[in-house]
Amino acid sequence: MRDLRALPAAGRRGQPVRILAGDYNATLDHAHFRRVLSRGYADAADRAGMGLTPTWSSPGGRIRLTIDHVLVDRRCAVHRVRVHDLPGSDHRAVFADVRLP
């Protein structure tokens, strides 16, 4: 997460549009993650009304968390987010349909 603090702010006119995706090991309420969101990024699943869809489960499935994210520049429109099981992985893949500005 420290590396993410070095990201330039998003959503500014004239700046490139950025989409960041991956295993952040952070829920939407994680402090460092919130700082990234405050720099002009939005969680695609949250924008699509699916912000609490679990992407990771503990062995046995007792704990289910949303820790894999697609972050979009706030200028982007998110049309749909889907989460799919990945055979052999304890994480689920996150797919987002995004419209660039």
Region roles according to the model:
Residues 1-21:
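His/acidic metal-ligating clusters that form di-metal
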Residues 9, 76, 101:
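Residue-level marker of positions within ordered structural domains that often coincide
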Residues 87, 99-101:
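A short C-terminal boundary segment appended to hydrolase-like catalytic domains
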